[in-house]
């Protein structure tokens, strides 16, 4: 089962209540926040409902490892370190990321890891408008493997 990275692109002004509730269920309360979800029909329905405010795609293990290493936070706002992952799970961050992508483990298996990754705005900006879909040359909606390039620019 693939993992999807979901990033909130647009703000919270004039957001309809069902979309706002969906974004809250995804824990995307602020712009440039990222969460990792499973590729299941229930999550895909939520993503479709909020597609005018988010972008998503399949994340790879290399990008997930960089995301955890650079932007992962533990409760108490402490950074995730190789030593912490080694102590709790007995493996490196790269091995953990690979197991998460393969579905053998979940991000919840790392104790005290916050589920939301706070990212910077992308270096070089969004290509095109923040109000149009990715297929139309904007920034919103499904972007497949290209989500990895966007996350690299936002780390």
UniProtKB/Swiss-Prot annotation:
Any one Gene Ontology BP term: maturation of LSU-rRNA from tricistronic rRNA transcript (SSU-rRNA, 5.8S rRNA, LSU-rRNA)
Signal peptide: none
A GO CC term attached to the entry: cytosolic large ribosomal subunit
Pfam families in the cross-refs: Ribosomal_L30
Any GO MF annotation of the entry: structural constituent of ribosome
Gene3D superfamilies linked: 1.10.15.30, Ribosomal protein L30, ferredoxin-like fold domain
Membrane-spanning segments: none
InterPro entries: Ribo_uL30_ferredoxin-like_sf (IPR036919), Ribosomal_uL30 (IPR039699), Ribosomal_uL30_arc (IPR005997), Ribosomal_uL30_CS (IPR018038), Ribosomal_uL30_euk_arc (IPR035808), Ribosomal_uL30_ferredoxin-like (IPR016082)
This protein's record includes keyword Isomerase: no
Keywords, alphabetical: Ribonucleoprotein, Ribosomal protein
Top-rank lineage group of the source organism: Archaea
Complexes and interactors: Part of the 50S ribosomal subunit.
Homology family: Belongs to the universal ribosomal protein uL30 family.
Listed name of the protein: Large ribosomal subunit protein uL30
Gene source species: Pyrococcus horikoshii (strain ATCC 700860 / DSM 12428 / JCM 9974 / NBRC 100139 / OT-3)
Lineage: Archaea, Methanobacteriati, Methanobacteriota, Thermococci, Thermococcales
Gene giving rise to this polypeptide: rpl30
């Amino acid at each position: 089962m693939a993992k999807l990275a979901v990033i909130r692109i647009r703000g919270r002004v004039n957001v309809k209540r069902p979309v706002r509730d969906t974004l809250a269920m995804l824990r995307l309360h602020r712009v440039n926040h990222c969460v990792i979800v499973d590729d299941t029909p229930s999550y895909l329905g939520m993503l479709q409902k909020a597609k005018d405010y988010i972008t998503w795609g399949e994340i790879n293990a290399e990008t997930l490892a960089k995301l955890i290493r650079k932007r992962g936070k533990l409760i108490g706002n402490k950074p995730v370190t190789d030593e912490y992952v080694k102590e709790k799970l007995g493996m490196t961050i790269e091995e953990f990321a690979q197991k998460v992508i393969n579905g053998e483990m979940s991000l919840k298996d790392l104790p005290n890891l916050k589920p939301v990754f706070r990212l910077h705005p992308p270096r070089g900006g969004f290509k095109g408008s923040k109000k149009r879909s990715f297929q139309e040359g904007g920034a919103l909606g499904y972007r497949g493997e290209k989500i990895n390039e966007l996350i690299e620019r936002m780390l």
